[in-house]
Curated annotation (Swiss-Prot):
It catalyses: tRNA(Pro) + L-proline + ATP = L-prolyl-tRNA(Pro) + AMP + diphosphate. The lineage of its organism: Bacteria, Bacillati, Bacillota, Clostridia, Lachnospirales. SUPFAM superfamilies: C-terminal domain of ProRS, Class II aaRS ABD-related, Class II aaRS and biotin synthetases. One of its GO terms (molecular function) is transferase activity. This is Proline--tRNA ligase. It comes from the Bacteria. GO terms for cellular component: aminoacyl-tRNA synthetase multienzyme complex; cytoplasm. It holds the Pfam family HGTP_anticodon. Keywords: Aminoacyl-tRNA synthetase, ATP-binding, Cytoplasm, Ligase, Nucleotide-binding, Protein biosynthesis. InterPro entries: aa-tRNA-synt_IIb (IPR002314), aa-tRNA-synth_II (IPR006195), aa-tRNA-synth_II/BPL/LPL (IPR045864), Anticodon-bd (IPR004154), Anticodon-bd_dom_sf (IPR036621), Pro-tRNA-ligase_IIa (IPR002316), Pro-tRNA-ligase_IIa_arc-type (IPR004499), Pro-tRNA_ligase_II_C (IPR016061). Catalyzes the attachment of proline to tRNA(Pro) in a two-step reaction: proline is first activated by ATP to form Pro-AMP and then transferred to the acceptor end of tRNA(Pro). Consists of three domains: the N-terminal catalytic domain, the anticodon-binding domain and the C-terminal extension. The gene is proS. GO terms for biological process: prolyl-tRNA aminoacylation.
Length: 479
């Protein structure tokens, strides 16, 4: 029993030290390991399999809307990166540069892509001539490099995996519609597959993406009450097209500039899953995204027939679910603890007494509820358990979010909430960046978004300066 206890004790309590808890979970659940390059990490099979499931399901949702996948080079010539002034200034501190190829010094530095707007713009400028060529709706799955000073696994790293979509359209209306459509796809995906509710809204001008006319965001609330920007969608208007000469002839044979969008999510979503659903025993994965949905654990497996029956059960379940069996010689208690640390959605226990009764025991990872089911009906019952678990995890996360949104009507109330109540603060804002800066300086709280669905005028004046205000903003401390 000491070994099982040690396995679980290796994870710090989240109430004691949330930061250390997170670090312990990503290591003990075998999601990642540190590499010899600071800020870069190794995805282990458990971690990469989660990303594969995110990629598979999100990619299918993209393609339903006409998105096509492409792949762009990793390197961007410096002259190309500098074509859009605001964009390059926004990324300059984080860009990694290649200055030498083999034994030769390069005539022009090459940026290791921090994002690929400029490459897509170059492509669009060559391939778009007529209104018949539009829209172009492209996406790529790749890694990008941003030389971060402070890094944390899955949340902020010097190299990370993501998808970046880039589109060009004939009209501003079409571009805006695509920008919002992709944000809605992200939010729907996170609810349906990750069991994470999102606050959707528009970023303030201070927080928007460099070079964008408008940035829309999905914001999730972590267990410690901090916000996590989990996906963004940008409307670039005709700024990039003008810088890169992306034009088309319309139906009247007149030359017009295109309107452009970009949108992306990254492996940061794995960090969100960990911090929304995890507990002191480790990872808790929603069944729809879990690499392994059920672990079969034989009890007293040394007894005649137990292992054979456990393998038969695994084969039967494998027709409908993602299944593994733990037939190692470790104790059942150790196996239970290992399954819980790794966040496997359920386990099925089967031993000699169960076999006599033609039954097995399903145990949910999130609640540890035990359900005795007939072996004849195990597939049907497990499907019900997994569906219920997925729904329960979403409802629990929704309840947590709703209970951690507080309204502030004046600045003293705002500061008191920021100091004592984790979560989002709803407050009115006049639109002046000076107030936004003051709030951040005084409280470390930043504007997260101006929400789409929530337009309640909770006050007539700005929470900071007291001037007339018409913009409701969600504020919060954030990763």
């Amino acid at each position: 029993m000491a070994k099982e206890k040690k396995l679980v004790e290796a994870i710090t309590s989240m109430e004691e030290d949330f930061t250390q808890w997170y670090t312990d979970v990503v290591k003990k659940a075998e999601l990642m390991d540190y590499s010899s390059v600071k800020g870069c990490m190794i995805f282990k099979p458990n971690g990469y399999a989660i990303w594969e499931n995110i990629q598979k399901n999100l990619d299918a949702m993209f393609k339903e809307t006409g998105v096509e996948n492409v792949y762009m080079p990793m390197f961007i010539p410096e002259s190309l990166l500098q074509k859009e002034k605001d964009h390059v200034e926004g990324f300059a501190p984080e860009v990694a540069w290649v200055t030498q190829g083999g034994l030769e010094t390069l005539q022009e530095r090459l940026a290791v892509r921090p994002t690929s707007e400029t490459l897509f713009c170059e492509l669009f400028s060559k391939t778009v001539q007529s209104h018949r060529d539009l829209p172009k709706v492209y996406n790529q799955w790749c890694s990008v490099v941003r030389w971060e000073k402070t890094t944390r696994p899955f949340l902020r790293s010097s190299e990370f995996l993501w998808q970046e979509g880039h589109t060009v359209h004939a009209t501003a209306e079409e571009a805006e519609a695509r920008t919002v459509q992709m944000l809605n796809i992200y939010a729907d995906f996170c609810e349906k597959y990750l069991a994470i509710p999102m606050v959707k809204g528009r970023k303030t001008d201070k927080e928007k993406f460099a070079g964008a006319e408008a940035t829309y965001t999905i914001e999730a609330l972590m267990h410690d009450g901090k916000a996590l920007q989990s996906g963004t969608s940008h409307n670039f208007g005709d700024g990039f097209p003008k810088a890169f000469g992306i034009q088309y002839t319309d139906k009247d044979n007149k030359l017009q500039y295109c309107h452009e969008t970009s949108w992306g999510v990254s492996t940061r979503l794995i960090g969100a899953i960990i911090m929304v659903h995890g507990d002191d025993s480790g990872l808790v994965l929603p069944p729809k995204i879990a690499p392994t949905q059920v672990m079969v654990i034989p009890i007293q497996q040394q007894k005649d027939g137990v292992l054979d029956k456990a393998y038969d059960l695994k084969d039967k379940l494998s027709k409908d679910f993602r299944v593994k069996i733990d037939a190692t010689d470790k104790t059942p208690g150790w196996k239970f603890a290992a399954q819980e640390v790794q966040g496997i959605s359920t386990r099925i226990e089967i031993g000699p007494k169960d076999i006599e009764k033609n039954q097995c025991v399903i145990v949910r990872r999130d609640t540890r509820e035990k359900i005795v089911v007939s072996l004849d009906e195990v597939n049907e019952k497990l499907a019900e358990v997994l569906e219920t678990m997925q729904n329960d995890m979403l409802e629990k996360a929704k309840a947590f979010l709703a209970s951690h949104i507080n309204d502030a009507h004046d600045y003293n109330e705002f500061k008191a909430i920021a100091e004592t109540k984790p979560g989002f603060i709803r407050a009115m804002w006049c639109g002046d960046e000076a107030c936004e800066n003051k709030i951040k300086e005084d409280t470390t709280v930043t504007s997260r978004c101006m929400p789409f669905g929530d337009q309640e005028q909770i006050s007539d004046v700005c929470v900071c300066c007291g001037k007339p205000a018409h913009k409701l903003v969600y504020w919060g401390k954030a990763y």
